[in-house]
Amino acid sequence: MASRKLVRDLLITKQPLLQQLVHQRRVGARLGLLQGNGFASHRRFSVFSEFSKKIRGEADSNPEFQKTVKEFKERAEELQGVKEDLKVRTKQTTEKLYKQGQGVWTEAESVAKKVSSSVKDKFSAATEEVKESFKLGKEESAESASSSGTGTTEGEKQQQQSGSTEEQDTFFGKFKSSISSPKLSEAFHKPLDFAKKGLDIVKDELRGNPSKRKHLEYTPPPPFTGERSTRTEMVIMPTKQSKWQKKWESLREKMQGYPVFKRLSGMSEPVVNKSQEIAEDVREKWETSDNPIVHKIQDMNERIFEETGSASTYKEIRRRDPSFSLPDFVSEIQEAIRPVLNAYSKGDAKTLKKYCSKELIERCTAEHRAFTSQGYFFDHKLLHVSEVDIQETKMMGTTPVIIVRFQTQEIFCVRDQDGKIKEGGQDTIHTVYYDWAMQQVDAAELGEDAIYPIWRLREMLRAGVQALI
């Protein structure tokens, strides 16, 4: 039965007429759902569209809402008008301010020109008055000189008095007469000196080299004119002890009074003595040993732990002068090179006394005498100083010595008595290398009032000369 039904269905579906009918039914069903424009007639709207329609309907039906909307539009238009008015007003105010500024600037320029012209006129008038006053003073001095030889008459006296009164009538004459009095001159000198000192301090600060204690120059204070005591009595003064020291001494005295402490001290004394003897024996054997290994260890110890010569000299310098500074010392030497070399070439012993020792001054004077006796004169000129550096520091006896090396460029020229060039020339430039030995002079050698030691040039050596031109 089932097979028959299947065969029947297949035969029915294969018929062409039946297929056409089924197709027409399907097309008709589709066309019934679509309109002429191709869209379906039954369209479903969203929830938002319906909500917007309701709001529009309520707005159209509500007259108050329409009034508020109109008011908002009117206010917006008014605000736009206000903005335009503000723009116009700002432009007008800026133009007015610019015009006022130009007017003020022109007025200031005119006033400045007037002031400058008036100042120039006053200055020229003052200079003329000063010149006239000087001329009057010269004429008065000439008249007084002539009158001293021939005797002054009454008419000449009246002329001098009238000239002096005319001079005193002027402003500068009054000022000059007021300054001539000793009281006013002293009153003016004090603030002037104070102002000069202040200006010097400000200049030093601006240049970067503020006034410090100098290491090379020493200006002794004025001598003491008062009475000095000659009494040499010795007075014993008790030492002041603090509270802790007093408590410690009282505790130590109490402990020494106990018998236990006495026994311990008696037992410790032989032990301490024996240990000291053993340590001394070991030290003697170590120092007097002939073993090469011991000698090598001693040499290594000396090389590593021994203080160098420069360190010991610098330590001695700081012990004598705690405020010593190497950079300041080098800068002072660089400033002193030019005057010292110029004074040495000219034989100026007065200038050399400020910087050099007695031995170097004596050598300079002897050399200068020898050259002048032979008719030679040095016409050197120092051009440039550079590369000032500390070369070495060492001890010379008990005084420290610092060796400074620098180089200069100078014109080498030697003349005779007639001024003729014997050696070198005005255009011969040499590079000269110098070594200076600066020795520290103790404060006791300078005087009683000296607090810190100073440095003196003990020896000067020309290490080499190189011709440039």
UniProtKB/Swiss-Prot annotation:
Q: Where is this region: Disordered?
A: 133-169, 208-228
Q: Name one GO biological process term.
A: protein targeting to mitochondrion
Instruction: State a GO cellular component annotated for this protein.
Output: mitochondrion
- Reported tissue expression: Expressed in roots, flowers, young cotyledons and leaves.
**Induction details:** Up-regulated after antimycin A or rotenone treatments.
Query: InterPro entries under this entry?
Result: NTF2-like_dom_sf (IPR032710), Tim44-like (IPR039544), Tim44-like_dom (IPR007379)
Asked if Transferase is a keyword of the record, the answer is: no
Provide the protein's localization: Mitochondrion inner membrane
User: Where are the compositionally biased (Low complexity) regions?
Assistant: 143-165
| Transmembrane residue ranges | none
Instruction: Give one Pfam hit by family name.
Output: Tim44
Primary role? Essential component of the PAM complex, a complex required for the translocation of transit peptide-containing proteins from the inner membrane into the mitochondrial matrix in an ATP-dependent manner. Recruits mitochondrial HSP70 to drive protein translocation into the matrix using ATP as an energy source.
Q: Which PANTHER family match?
A: MITOCHONDRIAL IMPORT INNER MEMBRANE TRANSLOCASE SUBUNIT TIM44
Quaternary structure, per UniProt, is:
Probable component of the PAM complex at least composed of a mitochondrial HSP70 protein, TIMM44 and TIMM14. The complex interacts with the TIMM23 component of the TIM17:23 complex.
Name this protein carries in UniProt? Mitochondrial import inner membrane translocase subunit TIM44-2
Source organism: Arabidopsis thaliana
Query: Gene encoding this chain?
Result: TIM44-2
